[in-house]
Amino acid sequence: MSIKEQTLMTPYLQFDRNQWAAQRDSVPMTLSEDEIARLKGINEDLSLEEVAEIYLPLSRLLNFYISSNLRRQAVLEQFLGTNGQRIPYIISIAGSVAVGKSTTARVLQALLSRWPEHRRVELITTDGFLHPNQVLKERGLMKKKGFPESYDMHRLVKFVSDLKSGVPNVTAPVYSHLIYDVIPDGDKTVVQPDILILEGLNVLQSGMDYPHDPHHVFVSDFVDFSIYVDAPEDLLQTWYINRFLKFREGAFTDPDSYFHNYAKLTKEEAIKTAMTLWKEINWLNLKQNILPTRERASLILTKSANHAVEEVRLRK
């Protein structure tokens, strides 16, 4: 089989950076450099150019999909003779720890909310749906945080199911990275958004990952468009270690931080600790649970050095 034939058989359209940037068309930049600086993560270089060449074309594509979805809802309402409920369009963002999912989510939230339609965009991270530390300790799962079994999947699925069912007020638990735990009584109420962005490690999992439980319902069953943020493993490890070092000098210095003791480490000790955490927890989770879901995404953003997206793959 020729390379051309193999290319034609892929379920994805592939764009290099320049090809993707051309899809921006005439969409105006709606974010200032100061706003972009506030949106980026602790260890990322997010430039005006990156937003213009990668995220503006993506927001344009998503706006087309969302408008199409609304038209389809209107057809159903016309057929049934009903007044429509506000059913949000759900976008999920998956990928490894340290790949930049949160930044992608925040940028898309800002861009999508500034389209002329003025749609209301909510952002929820699945961290809030982790079991509280007390439960994880009882189950021996503290070193498995972020693995599928560490989440209250029933509550997470009910959350997205309620939103898709038109429930007007839905609550989501909130996670604090300072205390490394779910905030007691800190729930956030989500009130009928037009768009919900759901960001998390395992949001692309499906029944294929649980063949022993074929009747399981998953978050992915309710998602309209899914994004996987990808990068080579060596870069992910480097980004994770660099982020850990920055936390050591910043967030970890807070006496209330769960990881306050890490602030006392020397740089060499901190690098060694970060590498151990990466290999024993985050790399393992990536290989076992996250990476196998990549090819299910509607769109894959592949990053190179400096968190710059070098390739985009869009499912046909």
From Swiss-Prot:
Pfam assignment, any one: PRK
Catalytic reaction equation(s): (R)-pantothenate + ATP = (R)-4'-phosphopantothenate + ADP + H(+)
Alphabetical keyword list: ATP-binding, Coenzyme A biosynthesis, Cytoplasm, Kinase, Nucleotide-binding, Transferase
Pathway: Cofactor biosynthesis; coenzyme A biosynthesis; CoA from (R)-pantothenate: step 1/5
One MF annotation (Gene Ontology) recorded for this entry: ATP binding
Superkingdom of origin: Bacteria
Protein name: Pantothenate kinase
Organism: Shigella boydii serotype 18 (strain CDC 3083-94 / BS512)
Organism lineage: Bacteria, Pseudomonadati, Pseudomonadota, Gammaproteobacteria, Enterobacterales
